[in-house]
C-alpha cells in the first residue's frame, strides 16, 4: 500500500488503524480455523492461500491500483499478457487446480477469468458435453485447446435477435451430402452471433450453435466446431467478425459479433456425442437432448462460488471502513470535548445495513462448495454411463442432472442478484470515498452485474426453476415422489394444512424451524400458483412472479440447509456459536425480512412476530455479532492484493493509504490537464464587447447617430 507520506501535522491526525487493530487483538476465535470452514476443509483452504500467494508475487498477475485507471485498450492488452502468463500455470498443474486458480482470479480481475473461462469453461466444456470421446481428444488434447496453444475457442450461442430462447436460434448448418460437409450460414442480421467473448480479436475456433438442416428438414439446434481464423490469425473465407465496442464493464474481454457466409466445414466437425449424422445424411437423434446443454452448468456453478468471494471481498472493505471511520459524537459523548467520534459500525442503522451481507457471504460459502462437488460427480457419472451405453445408469444420471439444473439455476440467479446488491449497498455505506474508483466498488459493480444476464438471464432461469417446483407439487398431489434436494416437497399435503411454523422470537432463533418455515412457504406459494394456473388454462406466464419467488426461496433453502449440515459436521466446535449467530442473522434479514410478505400471506408466521423480528430479534443479533466483525472478515483470508481497495486494507490505515494511492496515480506535480488549452481559452477569452469590435459601444453609437 502506498503511503501519503504526510510527516508534518499541526494537530492530532485520525488513527483508524488503531481501532481495527484493537478489535483484531480482541478476537475470540482463530480466523484461520474459521477459514477452513468457509473453504470446505483445511486442504482446500491451504490450496487457496498457496495460489493467492503465487499470484500476489507474480509481477504480471498481481493486481494494483493502476488497474482502475486503464483505458479499454490497455485493459485488453493487460488481459492478454495475463492470459499468456497463465498458460504457463495450466501446463504445470491439474485442471482442477487451475479451475480453483481461475476462481480466485475472478475476485480481483473478473475479465481475465472470463476470457479464460470462455475457452476452458465454455468452448472446452461444450466439446466435452456434446462431442464423442474421439472429438474431445482431438480438439481439446491433440489440438491443445485445453492449454490454449494453437487453439483458443469461443462459444457461439447468443444471436442478435435471440438470447434466452436457444431453441429459436436461426444460424443454419445445412448438410451437403455430395461433399460430406455442413454449410454454416447467417441468413439475416438477427442471426448474427452477438456478445461472443473472444470473437473480436482472440478466438481461432468457435463452438457454433446452429439449426441442423438435412434433406430440407430442420432437426433443431446442434453444435459445430467452426474455424474462425487461420494460423496467421487472419479470418477464414466467409467469416466476418467485428468488435461490439465499449460495454458497461469487463472491457478486457473482446466481445464480438460473427456472421457466416456459407462457410463449409467437414461433417465430422459437428459434435456427435448425442445427435449423429452419417455421410449418407441419416440423422440419429438423441433420446434425451437436454443432456447436450450440460456445458452451461459449469459456468453457473462457478458463479455461485464467485458470488461468495465477491460478497466476502466487499463486505470486508465496507466493514473495515465502518470500524476505522468515525463520524459525529453519539449519546453522552456529544458534550465531551475529549471524546472520540463514534465508529460508523457502532450506529445500529449501520449494523443493519452491513452485517446481513457479512452473514450472507458466510452462508453462500457452503452451498458453493456443495454444488461444485455435486456437478463434478454428476457429470463424471453421466460420461461413464453414456460411454458404457448403460441406460439404467444414464437414467439415474439424468435424474441427478434434473435436480442439478434446478439447484444451479436457482443458486446462480439468486446469488448473483444478491452479490450485486452487496457491492452497491456496501459502496453506499462507505459514503463519498466508496464512490472513488480506488475503493474498488465501481469497477467491480460494472464488471459484476453482467452475471445477472449471461449464461441464463436470472429471471428466465428463476422462472424455469419455479415452473419445475410447481410441476413437482402437482406430481406429489398426484401420488408421485420427488428426489434430490427438493424431496421436502413430498410433504405437500401435510404442510398445506399446518398452523404457523414460527410463533415466537424463540422460534426465530431455531434454525431448523426457520428451514421448515422456508419449506412450508415454498409449498404454499407453489400450490397457490398451481391454482392460478388452473384458472388460466395452464398459462405459466400468469404466475411469473410466483415462479421467481419460488426460485429464490429454493436457493435460500439449499443454502441454509447446506450451511447447517456443514456446521453440524465441523470439527472445531468452539466456532459453532459464532456460525449460529451468522446463520440466524442471515435467516432473519436476507430471508424472513425480505420475504415477509410471502410468509405472512401464507400464514407461516403471524403479523405480531414480524414486528418483533424487526424491532427485537434483528437488533439483538447485530449487537451479538458486532464485537467479532474483524475476526469474521479476516476469516475470508483475502489479501490486500485480492481486495485491491484503498479504503479496505488489512492494516486499517484508511486515510494514509487512500491519499497515497490518489497521489501516486495522479501526481500533484502535473497541475495542467491535457485539455488545459480549452480551459485557458474559456477563461482568457476577450470580452463580448471586444469580440464585437466595440461596434455596439456607447462611443460607436455617438459617432454613428450624428
Curated annotation (Swiss-Prot):
Its EC number is 1.3.3.6. GO terms for cellular component: peroxisome. Belongs to the acyl-CoA oxidase family. It comes from Debaryomyces hansenii (strain ATCC 36239 / CBS 767 / BCRC 21394 / JCM 1990 / NBRC 0083 / IGC 2968) (Yeast). The lineage of its organism: Eukaryota, Fungi, Dikarya, Ascomycota, Saccharomycotina. SUPFAM superfamilies: Acyl-CoA dehydrogenase C-terminal domain-like, Acyl-CoA dehydrogenase NM domain-like. Pathway: Lipid metabolism; peroxisomal fatty acid beta-oxidation. Keywords: FAD, Fatty acid metabolism, Flavoprotein, Lipid metabolism, Oxidoreductase, Peroxisome. It catalyses: a 2,3-saturated acyl-CoA + O2 = a (2E)-enoyl-CoA + H2O2. One of its GO terms (biological process) is fatty acid beta-oxidation using acyl-CoA oxidase. This is Acyl-coenzyme A oxidase. Its cofactor is FAD. It is found in: Peroxisome. Residues 682-706 are annotated as: Disordered. Residues 686-699 have a biased composition (Basic and acidic residues). It comes from the Eukaryota. InterPro entries: ACOX_C_alpha1, Acyl-CoA_ox_N, Acyl-CoA_Oxase/DH_mid-dom, Acyl-CoA_Oxase/DH_mid-dom_sf, Acyl-CoA_oxidase, Acyl-CoA_oxidase_C, AcylCo_DH-like_C, AcylCoA_DH/ox_N_sf. One of its GO terms (molecular function) is FAD binding.
